[in-house]
């Protein structure tokens, strides 16, 4: 992928983050997401490329912008597949909490798994334990494998888990095994990246989150040499088995079949992201473990962005200063 595109993509997440920031702490996650989506789409359409959204805000009948299959860019130049999550952590943005980021991953045509917006079970580790995880095995066995490979006891292992009611039993199991839990309210994209950074203090991420976030995170994981396995899970197997959830689950299974992917089947990293020629970029909205959040003084705002290129295995942290009046005028905010 053209190196110049990588910088362009970092500008996209910066704009989305700055748009979301206007709704920081205002209690309206939908308004924050809408602002980020509009800014991201506007910036994508300025780029000289022939791109398609493959992971986005939903199907064409569910989302007016950045829907799966939408064409973005000038329509000329390099063929690009794009996975976006304008805000990973909409609730955290609305409530002014930590770890909210804007995310984009890009690769060549057919780089990313095409999957519906549904639940996904994920197990993520860094490069130092690549090749030993197996979602077909019980969690305890995976934890013991990882600890052994790292030369650690289970009591020294740190597992990142989304703090959701569906994970209460998992968190209890990890504690009973003697391992440590780092529970986060949202934002498993940032958590996945953290596991794979060279100076990571987290050994693995495990849990059930969103499939779009899983595919976007897989780009960073592959670029950083980490490992991941995942499994698409119908809604009624995660939430209560109500008639409404069964109906949604049946639709999810049908959509998976149309895309050529099976539910409850283990997907390896190479199934999620098929090529190293990719870019992952994320910009902090609020302060977090991965990135600093936006800081504003009058008309000036500073952002921090991580930019990872798969082919060269480079990790860049970009700190930028933005004149907000000019930017918000362009974005019509």
From Swiss-Prot:
Residues noted as binding Mn(2+) 2 in the record, renumbered to the chain: 85, 88, 213
The record's GO molecular-function terms, alphabetically, read:
fructose 1,6-bisphosphate 1-phosphatase activity; metal ion binding
Pathways involved: Carbohydrate biosynthesis; gluconeogenesis
Concerning InterPro entries, the annotation shows:
FBPase_class-2/SBPase
Q: Where does substrate bind?
A: 88-90, 119, 164-166, 186-188, 210
| Function of the protein | Catalyzes the hydrolysis of fructose 1,6-bisphosphate to fructose 6-phosphate.
Q: Binding positions for Mn(2+) 1?
A: 33, 57
Q: Which SUPFAM superfamilies match?
A: Carbohydrate phosphatase
EC number(s) recorded for this UniProt protein: 3.1.3.11
Catalytic activity annotated for this protein? Answer: beta-D-fructose 1,6-bisphosphate + H2O = beta-D-fructose 6-phosphate + phosphate
Biological process according to GO: fructose 1,6-bisphosphate metabolic process; gluconeogenesis; glycerol metabolic process
- Intracellular or extracellular location(s): Cytoplasm
- What's this protein's name? Fructose-1,6-bisphosphatase class 2
The entry assigns this protein to a family as follows: Belongs to the FBPase class 2 family.
Q: Which cofactor does it need?
A: Mn(2+)
Q: Which UniProt keywords apply?
A: Carbohydrate metabolism, Cytoplasm, Hydrolase, Manganese, Metal-binding
The principal location of this protein is: cytoplasm
Give the domain of life. Bacteria
GO CC terms, sorted:
cytoplasm
């Amino acid at each position: 992928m053209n190196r110049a595109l990588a910088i362009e993509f970092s500008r996209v997440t910066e704009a989305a983050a700055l748009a979301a920031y206007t709704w920081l702490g205002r209690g309206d996650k939908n308004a924050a997401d809408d602002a980020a989506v509009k800014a991201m789409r506007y910036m994508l359409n300025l780029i000289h490329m022939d791109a398609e959204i493959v992971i986005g805000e939903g199907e064409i009948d569910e989302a007016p912008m950045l829907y799966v299959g939408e064409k973005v860019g000038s329509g000329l130049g390099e063929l690009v597949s794009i996975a976006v999550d304008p805000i990973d952590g909409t609730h955290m943005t609305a409530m002014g909490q930590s770890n909210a980021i804007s995310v984009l991953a890009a690769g060549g045509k057919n780089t990313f798994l095409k999957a519906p917006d549904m639940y996904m079970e994920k197990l993520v580790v860094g490069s130092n334990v690549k090749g030993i995880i197996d979602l077909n095995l019980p969690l305890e066995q995976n934890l013991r494998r990882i600890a052994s490979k790292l030369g650690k006891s289970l009591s020294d292992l740190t597992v990142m888990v989304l703090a959701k009611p569906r994970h209460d039993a998992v968190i209890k199991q990890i504690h009973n095994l003697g391992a440590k839990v780092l529970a986060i309210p949202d934002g498993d994209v940032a958590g996945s990246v953290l596991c794979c950074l060279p100076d990571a203090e987290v050994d693995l991420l495990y849990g059930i989150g969103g499939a779009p976030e899983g595919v976007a995170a897989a780009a960073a994981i592959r670029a950083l040499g980490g490992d991941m396995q995942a499994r698409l899970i119908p809604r009624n197997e995660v939430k209560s088995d109500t008639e409404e959830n069964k109906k949604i689950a049946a639709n999810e299974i049908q959509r998976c079949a149309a895309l050529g992917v099976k539910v409850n089947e283990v997907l390896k990293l190479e199934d999620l992201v098929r090529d190293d020629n990719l870019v992952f970029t994320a910009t902090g909205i609020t302060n977090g473990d991965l990135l600093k959040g936006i800081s504003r003084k009058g008309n000036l705002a500073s952002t921090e962005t991580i930019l990872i290129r798969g082919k060269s295995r480079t990790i860049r942290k970009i700190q930028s200063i933005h004149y907000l009046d000019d930017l918000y005028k362009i974005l019509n905010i």
